[in-house]
Amino acid sequence: LLLLVLSLTLTILSGNPQVTIYSFVIVSLFAIIRLWNGGTLRSLINTFPILLAVILSVALSAPQLLPSFELVQKSIRATESYIGQSNFGLLPIKDFLKFFVADFFGNPVTRNYFGFLNYFETSGFVGSLTLPVIIFAAIFLRKTRIIYFFFLLLVVSVVLCFNNPLSYFIYSFQIPFLTQSYASRMLFVTTFAISILSAFALNQIKLRPEKQDNFLKCVIWSWAIFVGILLGAWQV
């Protein structure tokens, strides 16, 4: 509980409202999924420590939160439209490649970056070998409530940070904190969900050697998918 309080407090104090809101929503939903068992009363008792941790973290962060709210009310961020000029920071489909090839569109260090926006706001690199692991998780990993939760988290975050009619419609509204910065910051949630699912998949491969043949199939499929995305990006 103390570790959770400390983590949430530091998240607030980090000064990134979007990431803070994402973190609190994920923690709350995960607590409900993980601890909501049996009757209503028992479930409320199980989730009370999480609620207490959230309240304590907000209370500890009050010396920063209160002046920040006053500053936001006087800020022009709510009325300016700078993110609209960059399509709200919604990523083009070709940026899927950056999940597995970080420098596919160059790197600012070598001064050859030619991708969308800037490198740091749009990079969701999770490792070159992650794609077959995610495919394995989607097809062969034993599904539980927690696994479904992280898959849903992955799908929702991808939809919201990439350019499509639904994400554009949502970001066309002025939702405080959430739609006042680039949508690509949702990649924080995407990479988190991918990391968790990859860990579950690798653990199952390690504990059940008979699953290794299935993993090899996923490696072949992943190469086919990657080549397809690469060819599609080349056409774009």
Regions found by a protein language model. Name each.
Residues 6-33, 56-68, 189:
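Transmembrane helices and adjacent periplasmic/lumenal helix-loop junctions
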Residues 42-69, 83-86, 149-158, 217-230:
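Hydrophobic alpha-helical membrane-interfacial segments at the cytosolic entry of transmembrane helices
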Residues 53-138, 183-188, 232-236:
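Periplasmic/ER-lumenal interhelical loops and adjacent helix-loop junctions
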Residues 113-122, 152, 156-193, 204-215, ...:
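Membrane-helix boundary/interfacial segments in multi-pass membrane proteins
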